[in-house]
A protein has these predicted regions:
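Beta/coil-rich, acidic/histidine-enriched accessory regions frequently appended to metallopeptidases
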Residues: 31-34, 38-39, 47-49, 213, ...
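Predominantly a core beta-strand signature of beta-propeller blades
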Residues: 290-295, 339-343, 391-396, 437-441, ...
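Active-site-proximal alpha-helical
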Residues: 81, 153, 174-264
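Juxtacatalytic substrate-recognition/specificity segment
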Residues: 28-168, 175, 192-193
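A flexible loop/linker signature enriched in serine peptidases of the S9 family
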Residues: 196, 322-332, 349-356, 372-384, ...
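Bacterial N-terminal signal peptides that target proteins for export
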Residues: 2-14
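Conserved beta-propeller blade repeats
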Residues: 141-142, 174, 301-318, 348-374, ...
Length: 567
């Protein structure tokens, strides 16, 4: 792998006079990348890149660790994707990495190109795939696989040359949901999360037929269609179906050859069979735990509710929610279920439906008296803490130490926050002091550490979290490619030494373990789809006299079968 630096010259173009840093000698190369000036940019990007056999991986300040991972990952994933789509990469592709979603939003690359995709799938512009890091290597891997798959599929369908691309795109009239769905199918296996999204969509009663469904949710509809073809008509017929559609320029002909039916009939069967399957699934589910209050929000086509945070105080009728309307984010506080107060309005109005996966974040303190909110504005991570008793924002400040924050909870007092955050391209656990604007680092490695929560068991207190580290004691390498499943770990909270004790609480082989939390004085819970359905598992932690930590996971006793929206 070779390392290059890029120097900026001119306003509209990025010209790279790069010199290879190695003992053999210097090799000069030139690369031109178009940049516009239509979006507000809050920092200057000093671009560098790694060059491998098949990819140029571009990154900027604080992104070297991520780029190192992506460069190796792309080379590792390429052969399998080439084999699946039955086509090889013809020339070196470019991967442009942004450190997080908000800096991706500042990008002008390919802003005016009609075939740039938006809304859930990796953007591709002239053989440049654009990805971002949200702190989770699994999501980054999916984006890289999507980008590789789109590069290969676009070359198959439309050709490698730009002029040929535009001409063939006009001639080959395949539905966008079909091609984007195929790319997503190649990039990501069908999962319980996708299955839950499909179930919610089909049982909502909003869609008259498949075309209506594909118009509203094209990526989900396309991915589900190809998964249906694989299950009903064999996996090897997925790529063959797309090949026939391209050759004959007719979906009916391809459908007749593979399914022995017209294309519309296949789509009708898709809707009918899946609806019947999900109705049977609902009948077999356990009842929800009994509660005292149900909160129902009226949904609208132009409004999404992306985060819901109830007040933890007993018998409280207060909750906070983030509303998203065409690029604008509203943090809204509801008291007594009806009194509405907008605490924050941020974002820029746009028709693009790209919801920020990270911000705003909400968290209540243990007493339910203060609400913390972390959000992104004007190129900075910002924090405010709203006091429900005094009815004003006690804290309004920038959080300077971190590049992005994925998760936030209050510690035992209102002055400290427990964070999963990215610093120097690594996702780690931190305890952040609000008054001093400094932090204590709990973990420090290249593995993703997510979903932290403070727990207290008999003879043991600490921070429980989800991580893809292979071993509790291992220190991650910046050259490693994390591939392990997410499992639950417990870090000693009071050991301040460099070698903080970390215990492994789960050993999931086939699915990730996420969202751990304390259930009672002896049990913790987490979500996993180990058996193919997302269930909440329970386990308990005990310490023997010899000082050995023993973990007991109740693998067959599910507390409930939650829908994805409840996680």
């Amino acid at each position: 792998m070779q390392f290059y630096q890029i120097k900026l010259k001119g306003k509209a173009f990025l010209t790279a006079f790069s010199f290879l840093l190695c003992s053999i000698g210097a090799i000069s190369q030139v690369n031109t990348v178009e940049f516009g000036k239509n979006r507000v940019q809050f920092r200057k990007f000093k671009w560098q890149y790694y060059q491998t056999d098949n990819f140029n991986t571009y990154f900027y300040q604080d992104g070297q660790t991520i780029a190192n991972y992506v460069a190796q990952l792309a080379e590792q994933e390429l052969p399998g994707i080439e084999q699946f789509v039955e086509y090889s990469l013809q020339r070196r592709a470019n991967i442009v990495i942004y450190n997080h979603f908000d800096e991706l939003q500042q990008s002008n690359i390919g802003l005016n190109l009609d075939w740039q995709t938006t809304g859930g799938i990796t953007k591709l512009v002239n053989n440049k795939m654009i990805v971002y890091f949200d702190g989770n290597h699994s999501n980054l891997r999916r984006q890289v696989r999507q980008g590789i798959a789109r590069t290969l599929v676009d070359n198959i369908l439309f050709g490698d040359d730009l002029g040929e691309f535009a001409a063939n795109q006009a001639l080959l009239d395949l539905p966008k949901w079909l091609t984007d769905g195929y790319i997503d199918y190649v990039a990501e296996d069908w999962s319980p999360e996708l299955d839950d999204q499909l179930k919610s969509a089909l049982l909502s009663g909003e869609y008259k037929n498949f075309y209506h469904f594909a118009y509203e949710k094209p990526l989900l509809a396309g991915h589900a269609f190809w998964n249906y073809i694989a299950e009903r008509y064999k996996p090897e017929n997925v790529t063959y179906f797309l090949y026939l559609a391209r050759v004959y320029r007719n979906l009916n002909t391809a459908s007749q050859r593979i399914c022995k039916k017209k294309f519309k009939e296949v789509l009708r069967e898709f809707m009918a069979e899946n609806e019947e399957k999900y109705y049977l699934d609902i009948r077999g589910r356990r009842n929800f735990p009994k509660g005292t209050i149900s909160i129902v929000e009226e949904t609208k086509h132009n409004k999404d509710f992306i985060r819901f945070t109830p007040n933890p105080a007993p018998r409280s009728q207060t909750y906070a929610v983030v509303e998203y309307i065409k690029g604008k984010y509203y943090v809204v506080l509801y008291e007594n279920l009806v009194d509405r107060k907008v605490l924050l309005k941020t974002g820029v109005r746009t028709n693009e439906n790209e919801v920020n996966p990270s911000y705003p974040l909400l968290a209540w303190d243990g007493k339910g008296a203060r609400l913390a909110c972390v959000y992104w504005e004007a190129g900075k991570v910002k924090l405010f803490v709203y006091d429900l008793v005094a009815r004003f924002k006690r804290v309004k400040q920038d959080i300077t130490p971190f590049e992005q924050i994925q998760d936030m909870k209050f510690m035992l007092n209102e002055k400290s926050l427990l964070l999963s955050a990215v610093k120097n391209g690594q996702s780690d656990i931190f305890i952040y002091n609000i008054d001093k604007d400094d932090f204590e680092q709990v973990t420090n490695d290249s593995y993703a550490d997510l979903d932290p929560s403070f727990v207290a068991f008999p003879n043991k207190t600490g921070i429980i979290f989800s991580s893809n580290r292979p071993d509790p004691s291992i220190k991650g390498r910046d050259t490693g490619v994390p591939v392990d499943r997410f499992n639950i770990f417990l870090a000693d909270n009071y050991n301040k030494s460099e070698f903080r004790q970390i215990s492994r609480l789960t050993d999931m082989k086939f699915s990730d373990a996420r969202y751990p939390m304390q259930y009672n004085t002896s049990h913790f819970t987490f979500i996993s789809a180990e058996n193919g359905v997302a269930n909440r598992y329970a386990g308990f932690f005990s310490t023997e006299r010899a000082g050995l930590d023993t973990i007991y996971v109740i693998g067959d006793n599910f507390l409930r079968n939650p829908d994805q929206r409840d996680l």
